[in-house]
Regions:
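Extended amphipathic alpha-helical regions
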Residues: 1-119
Length: 119
């Protein structure tokens, strides 16, 4: 399966919205102004939300308010040269994100040979 990562939805055609598998969010609702579903509660009924913050920091209030529909995960802060022992955990986080995306896709009817008719 091939994935296409895009920075924004400005160039989206209507049929693209049925192929969205995840939305990375900063927690600011203005980022959804050009989306088919402007309201985060509605958006995350149709697709998985993902927030990546710093390990040990609490996610912003907006993200916590969106509940279980947004995966909130954290990476270690960069501590400078010679302190990169924690970088191996980045791979764990990336694998966790991909697992969540794939699990969500299966739950919504995605298969290797076809996408669901509608999200």
């Amino acid at each position: 399966m091939r994935f296409i990562l895009v920075e924004g939805s400005e160039q989206f055609k209507p049929e693209y919205w049925n192929r969205i598998v995840a939305v990375f969010t900063t927690g600011q609702t203005w980022q959804f102004k050009n989306y088919k579903w402007h309201d985060p509660d509605e958006l995350f009924k149709h697709t998985l939300g993902i927030f990546v913050g710093w390990r040990g920091d609490q996610a912003p209030d907006n993200i916590r308010g969106w509940g279980h529909r947004v995966l909130s995960t954290g990476i270690d802060r960069w501590r400078g040269e010679g302190h990169d022992a924690s970088r191996f955990r980045d791979k764990e986080i990336v694998e966790h994100i991909w697992r969540a995306i794939e699990d969500n896709m299966r739950a919504r009817g995605w298969r290797k040979d076809r996408a669901p008719a509608a999200l």
